């Protein structure tokens, strides 16, 4: 694939960028974009964010010297040009593939990836840690740069870091705000560009410092007057006053697609005393028309046709997400007290139709998972029926609020937890494999998982009207194709015995239930009679059924798409221990390690929670063999 690119095919690494002329750099930028489009059209991925930072990546590599100079990219959505232009040009076609390179930045993958991430708004905190660490080690000549998107600045953690950095005021510490939505009212005219060049120049900065040094002899009042005058004048033309108030030297906004302007400005700000915030504006999806026209859709996509931008869709049942979204709309039509909250996941959580139909009852709070949870708690306290839609991996960020603001007060918030279990290509930063463990230990919390589409609808209905903190978790991707109609309440804490057996019984939660049935069906043909139970409630468990099963079976196999540490299987063992019941219990689930990226079916097979893995576990258990 690389042979088609005149510049990129012979490109060796960041040192080449420092020697290219601007015409060559422009060609390189175009080739990098084309390469990203070609690879992501086959593999899927975060197209829009990466296409928007090609020139910025080139400028950073031209001005700075990583890995000695540390560059921290927020989340990693913008990381594809970085991977290509550092040391993964040849490996880029394996992007997001099993055993290939990650869709995010990973320290294990390259010396250029200073800090890994998959969740937003961590870059400034991490970069500040690098900066202070270098200062303490005497490495004061190195630079530390954080690159963060404007969307990530909706999260409180970013402002906590800005506030701390503004207080410490380290030198050679630069935060680059990649504004690809222009949500911070950029002023990008000729006057702003000219003034920006002046403000960032060495002469103005040196003169500014000399004036401050002189005024210090006359006390604080003249310095304060100077600062207020500066802020007033800059506030007329600049959106950066808030950053100045936090203690940063604000520069910008500048064109994030002008390599020379970026290079000149970066060189100018390198020696400004104290922390610098450089505001650059970019176009999400630049260079690919479909992505430019619909940046939300093209933030992250499945494989697509390059010519048309049409997403390649395989024939499959409805997704768990779409089943949830449709059910919530139906329930909201009946009950005006139902409201929906999401932290910047309207599309991903299946709430687009809800937002259209009930705009006054839909709240996208931005990347603010903690606020979303406590906001939902307040709505519940006022008598509404809030449904807070999270990805499992992001609910982790609101754990204190789940405990302190919802569960402790026993407020009826329904948590719709999408992307539970192994999510696939996005890998360990996005797998939702901890929620059963961290939720089942919380008092007052109901925790459940549906086996299929109809049960998802019924459990959602049950949760909304339960009057309790209620967590409903379901996986990413296509469901099983089970027909759906209506809603019915399910008694909380009840399980469902789907198949009676003799030799052993499988207790499965959520997605693995049908996998257990498939395994049992195959074993039945060989005369091995295995029971299967849909253990849909992880908390409270069906203790009555567990006692009954203990009278009929000696071997229990628990299956969950969650870590085995503290998960559903642990709960079964805890119950038997409390009751003094001695049984052999084998726990299948995600082992105590971070699972890599890859297709869901590959990963589920890897950890042994698909039909094949469950069948093997039964055979090993019945012959007394050890599970691996």
Curated annotation (Swiss-Prot):
Q: Would the keyword Magnesium turn up in this protein's UniProt record?
A: yes
Q: Which cofactors is this protein said to need?
A: Mg(2+); thiamine diphosphate
Example GO CC term: the record gives: cytosol
Report whether Metal-binding shows up as a keyword of the record. Answer: yes
Q: Which reaction does it catalyse?
A: D-glyceraldehyde 3-phosphate + pyruvate + H(+) = 1-deoxy-D-xylulose 5-phosphate + CO2
The positions annotated for binding Mg(2+) are 150, 180
Q: What is its EC number?
A: 2.2.1.7
InterPro entries xref list: Dxylulose-5-P_synthase, THDP-binding, Transketo_C/PFOR_II, Transketolase-like_Pyr-bd, Transketolase_BS, Transketolase_C, Transketolase_CS
**Which GO-annotated molecular functions does the record name?**
1-deoxy-D-xylulose-5-phosphate synthase activity; magnesium ion binding; thiamine pyrophosphate binding
Q: Which UniProt keywords apply?
A: Isoprene biosynthesis, Magnesium, Metal-binding, Thiamine biosynthesis, Thiamine pyrophosphate, Transferase
This entry's comment on the bound cofactor is: Binds 1 Mg(2+) ion per subunit.
Query: Which first-to-last residue range defines the signal peptide?
Result: none
Q: In which pathway does it act?
A: Metabolic intermediate biosynthesis; 1-deoxy-D-xylulose 5-phosphate biosynthesis; 1-deoxy-D-xylulose 5-phosphate from D-glyceraldehyde 3-phosphate and pyruvate: step 1/1
- What's an example GO BP annotation here? thiamine biosynthetic process
Q: Which Pfam families match?
A: DXP_synthase_N, Transket_pyr, Transketolase_C
Question: Which positions are annotated as binding thiamine diphosphate?
Answer: 77, 118-120, 151-152, 180, 288, 369
Q: Which family does it belong to?
A: Belongs to the transketolase family. DXPS subfamily.
Quaternary context: Homodimer.
Identify the HAMAP family for this entry: DXP_synth (MF_00315)
- Tell me the function of this protein: Catalyzes the acyloin condensation reaction between C atoms 2 and 3 of pyruvate and glyceraldehyde 3-phosphate to yield 1-deoxy-D-xylulose-5-phosphate (DXP).
**What name does this protein carry?**
1-deoxy-D-xylulose-5-phosphate synthase
């Amino acid at each position: 694939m690389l042979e088609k690119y005149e510049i990129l095919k012979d490109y060796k690494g960041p040192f080449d960028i420092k020697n290219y002329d601007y015409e060559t750099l422009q060609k390189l930028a175009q080739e990098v974009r084309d390469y990203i489009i070609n690879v992501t059209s086959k593999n899927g991925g975060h197209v829009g964010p990466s296409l928007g930072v090609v020139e910025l990546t080139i400028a950073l590599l031209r001005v700075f010297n990583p890995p000695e100079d540390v560059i921290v990219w927020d989340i990693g959505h913008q990381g594809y040009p970085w991977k290509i232009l550092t040391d993964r040009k040849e490996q880029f076609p394996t992007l997001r593939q099993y055993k290939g390179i990650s869709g995010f930045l990973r320290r294990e993958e390259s010396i250029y990836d200073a800090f890994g991430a998959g969740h937003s708004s961590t870059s400034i905190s991490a970069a500040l840690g690098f900066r202070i660490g270098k200062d303490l080690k005497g490495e004061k000549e190195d630079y530390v740069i954080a690159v963060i998107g404007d969307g990530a600045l909706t999260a409180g953690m970013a402002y906590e870091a800005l506030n701390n950095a503004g207080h410490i005021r380290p030198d050679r510490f630069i935060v680059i705000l990649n504004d690809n939505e222009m949500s911070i009212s950029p002023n990008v005219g000729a006057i702003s560009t000219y003034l920006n060049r002046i403000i960032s120049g060495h002469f103005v900065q040196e003169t500014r410092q000399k004036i401050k040094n002189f005024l210090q002899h006359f006390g604080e009042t003249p310095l304060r007057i100077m600062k207020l005058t500066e802020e007033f004048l800059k506030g007329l033309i600049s959106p950066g006053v808030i950053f100045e108030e936090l203690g940063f030297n604000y520069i910008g906004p500048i064109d994030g697609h002008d390599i020379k302007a970026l290079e000149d400005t970066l060189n100018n700000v390198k020696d400004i005393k104290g922390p610098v915030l450089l505001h650059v504006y970019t176009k999400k999806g630049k260079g690919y028309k479909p992505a430019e026209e619909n940046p939300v859709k093209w933030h992250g996509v499945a494989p697509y046709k390059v010519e048309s931008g049409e997403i390649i869709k395989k024939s499959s049942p409805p997704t768990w997400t779409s089943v949830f979204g449709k059910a919530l709309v139906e329930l909201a039509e009946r009950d005006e007290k139902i409201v929906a909250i999401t932290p910047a996941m309207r599309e991903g959580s299946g709430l687009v139709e809800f937002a259209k139909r009930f705009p006054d009852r839909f709240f996208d709070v931005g990347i603010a998972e903690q606020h979303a949870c406590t906001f939902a708690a307040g709505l519940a306290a006022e008598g509404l029926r809030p449904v807070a839609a999270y990805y499992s991996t992001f609910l982790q960020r609101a754990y204190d609020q789940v405990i302190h603001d919802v569960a402790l007060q026993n407020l009826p918030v329904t948590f719709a937890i999408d992307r539970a279990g192994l999510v696939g290509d996005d890998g360990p930063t996005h797998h939702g494999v901890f929620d059963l463990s961290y939720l089942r230990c919380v008092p007052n919390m109901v925790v459940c998982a549906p086996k299929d589409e109809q049960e998802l609808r019924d459990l959602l209905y049950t949760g909304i009207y339960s009057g309790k903190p209620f967590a409903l978790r379901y996986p990413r991707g296509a469901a099983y194709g089970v027909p759906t109609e209506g809603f019915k309440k399910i008694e909380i804490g009840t399980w469902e015995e789907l198949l009676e057996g003799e030799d052993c019984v499988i207790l499965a939660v959520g997605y693995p239930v049908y996998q257990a049935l498939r395994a049992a069906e195959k074993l039945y043909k060989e005369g091995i009679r295995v029971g299967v139970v849909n253990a849909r409630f992880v908390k409270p468990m069906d203790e009555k059924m567990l006692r009954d099963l203990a009278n009929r079976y000696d071997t229990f196999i628990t299956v969950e798409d969650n870590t085995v540490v503290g998960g559903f299987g642990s709960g079964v063992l805890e119950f038997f221990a409390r009751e003094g019941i001695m049984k052999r219990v084998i726990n299948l689930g995600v082992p105590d390690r971070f699972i890599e990226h890859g297709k869901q079916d590959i990963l589920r097979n890897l950890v042994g929670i698909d039909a094949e893995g469950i069948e093997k576990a039964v055979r090993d258990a019945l012959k007394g063999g050890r599970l691996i």
